[in-house]
Every structure is written in structure tokens, then in C-alpha cells.
From Swiss-Prot:
The chain crosses the membrane at residues 10-30. Residues 502-563 form the SH3 domain. This is Alpha-(1,6)-fucosyltransferase. The gene is Fut8. A motif (SH3-binding) lies at residues 299-305. It comes from Rattus norvegicus.
Amino acid sequence: MRAWTGSWRWIMLILFAWGTLLFYIGGHLVRDNDHPDHSSRELSKILAKLERLKQQNEDLRRMAESLRIPEGPIDQGTATGRVRVLEEQLVKAKEQIENYKKQARNGLGKDHELLRRRIENGAKELWFFLQSELKKLKHLEGNELQRHADEILLDLGHHERSIMTDLYYLSQTDGAGDWREKEAKDLTELVQRRITYLQNPKDCSKARKLVCNINKGCGYGCQLHHVVYCFMIAYGTQRTLILESQNWRYATGGWETVFRPVSETCTDRSGLSTGHWSGEVNDKNIQVVELPIVDSLHPRPPYLPLAVPEDLADRLVRVHGDPAVWWVSQFVKYLIRPQPWLEKEIEEATKKLGFKHPVIGVHVRRTDKVGTEAAFHPIEEYMVHVEEHFQLLARRMQVDKKRVYLATDDPALLKEAKTKYSNYEFISDNSISWSAGLHNRYTENSLRGVILDIHFLSQADFLVCTFSSQVCRVAYEIMQTLHPDASANFHSLDDIYYFGGQNAHNQIAVYPHKPRTDEEIPMEPGDIIGVAGNHWDGYSKGVNRKLGKTGLYPSYKVREKIETVKYPTYPEAEK
């Protein structure tokens, strides 16, 4: 009877644990009713969890019934086995209780995070607007008006930095910073496991493959993004990426001489059948599919940016300000794992240059971009935002020196910057600027230079650049892999973030807007706006898809429309 007394203690403990868990979740349901604006979607998820727990509780009840002392002889082996199962269930129950407690303590909820980021964006957009409008007043009349306008701008700068500092501390309060750190790490590890599983099939001869040739006719940043696009299609169609990089214009030995191979088990493109991309469904019986550049892709699959995986979307929206960039960054992270020699080169360059924090990264693209894809921007335009961000950093950390990592393809710019801004410490390697020139661009030395520039730009506390440049966007993408959420750690002098060949970038109107000029478009809440760009003056430009009208609209009156797609989830990667 003593053995059975011990068993019943376990049973009572299990039932008590599950009862506690049910009560705990039930309490959350009651508290949520105090907030009528809480989304029905979140409520239904909690109810679904509750239903599952009720079912598990019923299963345990039946198991407990089966362990009642029977009339007649006792099968000790069977009873011991059942008790062991119940012990395991108890451990799981305790873990779930702790997880729910942690979520309540640290997870502030998706709506809280969305609101926090909207306040942050609204404050910044207000600042852009006021700067633009008040600067216009300088030219109206008299020195007095100009002096007064300068004072207003100065005061507004203090206000804006105060708001941004408060928001930063809000983002870290009540364990939110620790939660965000852990959640971002968990999501990254999950995605990297899935990619690693896909890229390392047990039998390469039977694996479904997608072939991507790196030699697109463009520079390093563009070629890297080309491979990322291939990788995302491979991931979505459950095909192992085969990267063809021999005679790469930057390194004739191929990708693997610089970065780690994209696969340890499968680099051979051979297969029973081969064909050019004709769509996921049409290619289902083709083992090896060759992918064209994104400009020639037809039909276009749903896996292109700016879409994110459906199964990760809710978690990503909570933890990151731009889920689409985070998703792209995961493929960049996997691709640019350095070979040992490159890792050593980066370490030596870090020491030689004296790269340390706090530091702001500035990327100035000149040469072939100016006059074609981008306008000329003097160094003064960049340094305005550098100074603003150093003043913001000084609110929450000690700024011993105002360091700037300057990356440019204009060798004369470093001297100009040092002359004009002697109170800054410029960190730069002018040999990289020379190697980035048009005549030296496609060499191994140039590749080393652009990799180092991108590395240090991504390591900076803040990035000032032009998003029309692929190098700048790559640095921004890598930056996302180094922090839980670095989506706001930049200022672009021209474009908003985009991925070449992406699907439409849409926003949703949250406030109505009545045009005041012919340049503006009307909006009603819920309208879908196809965004063309942000003018960084409080207004963006786009098309109201319902009305078919293109024009300006206040940036704060919209929010991002998160596009999701049903990507494979690769459960085998967790085994």
C-alpha cells in the first residue's frame, strides 16, 4: 500500500499543478476583459490554449482513474510505468506554469510594442516636419525672425531627444529589454537551424536543388542581394541552394575562398532532371531548377520580400520594428560566415583602426552612383544627423569622443571631413576608398575593402547613409543580426529601405487625411497606400490604391502592412 500512497501523492500534485495552470490562465482572461480594445485574435489564441489545457487535464484525469487501487493483484511494472509518465507530465506542467509567469512578467504584448514604435515614429516625423516648416520661416523677413526660428529649432531638438530617450527607457523597463534579447536570440537560432537543415541533406543525389549563379552584372552588395533572393526562393520551395561562384569577378576561386560554403554536404548540381524556373507548381517534378535574376523571374512566387513567414509573424511583430528586414537579414547572416583568414583580417583591422564605441557609421557613395541612381550629397548633410544622434546618445551614455567610421569611394573625402569637423575623430582606411574606385572595383583587394567597410558600418551604434546604395542596405541588414531590434538605428538621406525586386510595399491608413494642396492625396482609415518613399519632412509619397491617386500624405497617419506567406516550417530541423 505504501507504493500506492506515493503514487497518489504524485497524482494529487499533478492535478493540483494543472488546476493552478488553468486558474492562472483563467485569471488572465478575466483581466483582459478590462481592456475592451484587446484584439479578438489574441483572445481566441488564449481560448485555444485553454481548450488544449482542458483536454490535457481530462487526459490526466483518465490516467489517474486507471491508477486507482484495483481489486485483486497489482501489476507493479505497469503501475510504475504509468507513474513515470505522470512524473514527466508534472515536470512539463511546472515548466508551462513558469513560462506563463515569465510571459506575464516580461512579454508586454504585441499591441504595447506596436504602440511604442508608433509613438517613436510619430515623434520623429513631427521633428522632420517642424524642421522643414520652420526653416522656411528664415527666408520670410528680417534677422529677428531668423534668430527666433533658430531658437525654436534648438528647443524642439531638446524636446525630441527627451521623448526619444524616454521611449528608449520604456523599451527596457520591467524586464522588456531582457525579454526582447531572449526572444530575438530564440527566433534567430530557430531560423538558422531551419536553414542549416535545408542546406545539408543526408543524400545530395536525391535532394531537390535550386541553382543560383553569383555572377550577376553588378557590384558586391548587389550580388549578395541576388544570392539572398535565390536563397529565399530555395527556402520557400524546400530546395537546397547550390551556389555557382567559380570565376567570380571578385575572387576567381569562388565564394568559398572568402566565406564558408553554403552547404557542407551538397554542392553538386547534378540530378535526374534539370529545368529553368517555371513556377513552384510546374517545377514540382523537376529535381534541379535554375533560377534567373529577379528582374527576369516569371512567374513570381510569394516568397519575395517584403513578406515574412506566417508561423513567425506574430513573434516578429512584437520583437522587431521591421520584420521584413529581419527576415532578409537571417539569410545574409548565414551567407557571410567568414573563413578563418577573413575573420583574422577583421580582428586585425579593428585593432589597427582603433574602432570602438560609441561610433556612428557614415557611408558616402559617389563615383558611378551620382547622377544615375543617386543625387550628390555633401558631407554636411550627413554630419547634421551624426551630431543629432551623438546628442541623443549623450542622454544615456558617456560620450568620451565623437567617433565616425567613414566609408566612401571618394579618397578626397576623409581629408575634407577632418578639416571641416575637427572636433570629431574619423576612423577610415583610405586604401579602401582607392580600391573602391571604378578602375579597381572588381579585384580581391576591393572585395576585402568592401567587406571591411560593411562590417564596421554594421557594428556602429547608428548609421547615416543613402539607402539607394546596396552597401548601405547590406550594412543595415547585418546590423539587425547584432541587436534585438536595430530597425530605427539609421538615417537615410534618400530612399526608405527596399530590396531590389521586392513585391509592393504597402501601408495602411490609420487616420483620415484631407488634402490641403493639389500635391496631397485623401485617405480614410483602412485605405491601402502603396509607398514610394519618405521625404523625411513629415510627408511620404505614395498611391492610394482604392482611389488610384498618387501624391503626398502625412507619414504619421499610416502604419506598415505586414505581408505574410506560408513558408515551410521544417519540423525535421528540431529533431
